[in-house]
Amino acid sequence: MAGNDCGALLDEELSSFFLNYLSDTQGGESGEEQLCADLPELDLSQLDASDFDSATCFGELQWCPETSETEPSQYSPDDSEFFQIDSENEALLAALTKTLDDIPEDDVGLAAFPGLDEGDTPSCTPASPAPLSVPPSPALERLLSPVSEVDELSLLQKLLLATSSPTASSDALKDGATWSQTSLSSRSQRPCVKVDGTQDKKTPMLRSQSRPCTELHKHLTSVLPCPRGKACSPPPHPSPQLLSKEDEEVGEDCPSPWPAPASPQDSLGQDTANPNSAQVPKDDVRAMVQLIRYMHTYCLPQRKLPQRASEPIPQSCSSPLRKVPPRSRQTPKAFWTEFSILRELLAQDILCDVSKPYRLATPVYASLTPQSRTRPPKDSQASPAHSAMAEEVRITASPKSTGPRPSLRPLRLEVKRDVNKPARQKREEDEEEEEEEEEEEEKEDEEEEWGRKRPGRGLPWTKLGRKMDSSVCPVRRSRRLNPELGPWLTFTDEPLGALPSMCLATETHDLEEELGGLTDSSQGQQLPLGSQIPTLESPCESGCGDTDEDPSCPRPPSRDSPRCLMLALSQSDPLGKKSFEESLTVELCGTAGLTPPTTPPYKPMEEDPFKQDTKHSPGQDTAPSLPSPETLQLTATPGASHKLPKRHPERSELLSHLQHATTQPVSQAGQKRPFSCSFGDHDYCQVIRPEAALQRKVLRSWEPIKVHLEDLAHQGATLPVETKTPRREADQNCDPTPKDSMQLRDHEIRASLTKHFGLLETALEEEDLASCKSPEYDTVFEDSSSSSGESSFLLEEEEEEGGEEDDEGEDSGVSPPCSDHCPYQSPPSKASRQLCSRSRSSSGSSSCSSWSPATRKNFRLESRGPCSDGTPSARHAKKRREKAIGEGRVVYIRNLSGDMSSRELKKRFEVFGEIVECQVLRRSKRGQKHGFITFRCSEHAALSVRNGATLRKRNEPSFHLSYGGLRHFRWPRYTDYDPTSEESLPSSGKSKYEAMDFDSLLKEAQQSLH
């Protein structure tokens, strides 16, 4: 695992470490005097205690000048910018690192370094490193490899990677090469380039060690050694830059990052051979180690980040490389004060963009170390040989990673607070908290297991029909993007023996209790120290690389109210019994694939927009996408009303609406109407009329006159009764019509509706003032009767034609003579009221244009009669007419045959679309007929204008069609739109465009555009 950089060491701790060494007065003189005497090359007079508070306290001492005098042949060409040190500081490092070589084995030795004391074993066999609790650094273990035949390589050089002397002899390189060949599978992808500057690299170290030791050596070896049984604080983990530097210097061909640690006997043999060695207090040794490590840390430029490979590698427990006596499980530990995931990612050679971990199928956090391996069993962890492991910073894989392949399961990072205490003493102090910590650890492990078993990536368990909690979706953890996750940190002081066993506990725990305990305990354990390390333990970081899930292991129950660590996706089970593809759909819909500015990971996501808005029972929770057959069956059972029967192709949607919307209560007057009997395009804005308005205006059919007269008489006689009956009784007559299997045409539908609903003129007189005041109703119901004068939209033409016919002795001012096509006549008062209620601004092109404006105005005023007071009925009729004209739904037809009736005309033009009104008027003077047809849609009207002339018979004159009632689109003086009109005014005083008809204007406008 890549360690932290030098910035992880806090200035306060550095200051205390260094001042601890300076204040040591066991030699009889002050620490500053001793240090100045021991290190004549450095001028420390310019430093005082205040200088140690800043990170640049050694900046003036020139530990790492940019321009180095060292020979470039020592380094490989790729490492030219790495650690460089001049000869002056090289002497200091050589003096400091050689001092511990003379420490006797039985007095201090590796006891000063608990990391080595428990990580090193007497075994010198290179093929037996045990499963380590922390994956050791490749460069560190390469330095810790057996070097019993090399006396020059000191113990501290192995610990601190003195880069001024990278290799002591060719034997060390040979050992490293041997390790490279034995563990090729352990090395991630790096170019195998062997550096052949062995003798050149050896020379600087020999030169630095040839310098005589100063008084510092005598001072450090003149004190009584501390007993070995008392372990000091673990030595600091070497900086990642130094590790990477040594890794590249010693040999880039070495693919083995895990050689066996050096045995204590080999390392301490040199110490026992020194007769002048004396006991050294553990505080001095600790301070010395910290000081040297501090100096080495500052020797590396900050801008250079190492490139470390981090791909998980297969590690089998049966491999000979993993079998070592238990004491070699522990290696030097990293104890940085603040853990940074970004630092971890940058320190590794990840084949992806680590700045966007949320774009990965598997989170990079799950593979922070390429050496994820099995935690040792509980009984072996509790052995006395591993007592000091309680001080370590562990990054361990979850309990199930026992296979030979890499484990991408979430990692748990644990750090111990009191790193300066001996391991045994700490274990004695923590015995009271073992049980509590063990329970928390078991909860964490089960949460890990629960997170690993989430579906969505093709795991075998998804094919077994397992269900997961549908209300939680894993969210990636990032303190930079999610401030709420900052305090979610866990510290455990639990000894290693108290950890849970490898297998997941068989009893099922409540997930809410687990997550609550985890978050509450982790927040309660926050320390005032600056060292807070996030626990990398989450379902979102569970891997998809482990496919050996045990189906017998229980899964925690679902949790209804997840915290910020979970993301609510859906309230139904998204993966009840779905296949891999459907599960992947849910995963892709999660936040892992979204950028943070779009959907922050801590913000709950909305429901699936494509999910049906139906509430399922607990047994009917299904995924919103791709429902299974049993899902459809379950859903259709309670909500049958949402599933309409399949319509026959010949039945229109309008009939279905009529069939299902016939149960409106009487008291719902003024509410929105679910449908319109007139099949309007604006059904949503129609209102429900009271029962008094039940027999509302609908389209009249072209059925025989006798039928209409009978219906009229029957409806007129039973009006008081029908107004009190529910609407469903009146609409039940519509049911036989849609049940008919033969294809129904629009005119047949309208005929059937007209037959059963009819039109009561007497009821309309009462309705207009009571129910037609609503603007929604006024602008929508354009479904008045077809052929009679009282139901006409555009009776202005009738008025003008009536005026013309009055001059000729024909009484058409009240109603045009339409006995051949009008089944029944309305009372004269009603017809007169409806006639004069129409606005003259909507006149068709057949109006008498020869009249002067004054004459026309006078006739309008006279013809309005009793309706000139502007009643709501008149306003309503005017509004409906203007709306139809403005939408271009009115077609004016000239030159009709003498025997043409409105019913026949309507039947012919129904081929273009639904007709709201059809009216035929007669001109007695010329014996010609003209008609108006109002379509439901303007598109149908336009189609009829273009192709209506083809509907005539052979013995009939040709039709002349144009849009009617478009006076507001024309000039004050206008001519008939019909180019063959005989009544057009002379165009002498008009411009070119005023004299042109509409079609000509349209063609010219189109030509001008091209």
Curated annotation (Swiss-Prot):
Molecular function terms from GO: AF-2 domain binding; nuclear estrogen receptor binding; RNA binding; transcription coactivator activity
Motif (LXXLL motif 2): 156-160
GO cellular component: mediator complex; mitochondrion; nucleus
CDD domains per the UniProt record, alphabetical: RRM_PPARGC1B
Localisation: Nucleus
Keywords: Activator, Nucleus, Phosphoprotein, Repeat, RNA-binding, Transcription, Transcription regulation
InterPro entries (UniProt xref): Nucleotide-bd_a/b_plait_sf (IPR012677), PGC-1 (IPR034605), PPARGC1B_RRM (IPR034177), RBD_domain_sf (IPR035979), RRM_dom (IPR000504)
Biased composition (Acidic residues): 429-449, 795-811
Placement of sequence motif LXXLL motif 3: 342-346
Motif LXXLL motif 1: positions: 140-144
Region Abolishes DNA transcriptional activity when missing: start-end pairs: 1-91
Compositional bias ranges of the Polar residues kind: 178-189, 264-279, 369-384, 619-638, 659-670
Tissue: Ubiquitous with higher expression in heart, brown adipose tissue.
GO terms under biological process: actin filament organization; bone trabecula formation; cellular response to reactive oxygen species; energy homeostasis; estrogen receptor signaling pathway; mitochondrial transcription; negative regulation of DNA-templated transcription; ossification
Gene3D superfamilies cross-referenced by the UniProt entry: 3.30.70.330
UniProt feature, compositional bias: Low complexity: 521-532, 782-794, 832-852
Swiss-Prot/TrEMBL induction comment: Induced by combination of forskolin and dexamethasone in primary hepatocytes.
Residue span(s) of domain RRM: 889-963
Assembly and oligomerization: Interacts with estrogen receptor alpha/ESR1. Interacts with Sterol regulatory binding transcription factor 1/SREBF1, PPAR-alpha/PPARA, thyroid hormone receptor beta/THRB and host cell factor/HCFC1. Interacts with Estrogen-related receptor gamma/ESRRG and alpha/ESRRA. Interacts with PRDM16.
Domain remarks: Contains 3 Leu-Xaa-Xaa-Leu-Leu (LXXLL) motif, which are usually required for the association with nuclear receptors.
Record-given protein name: Peroxisome proliferator-activated receptor gamma coactivator 1-beta
Organism: Rattus norvegicus
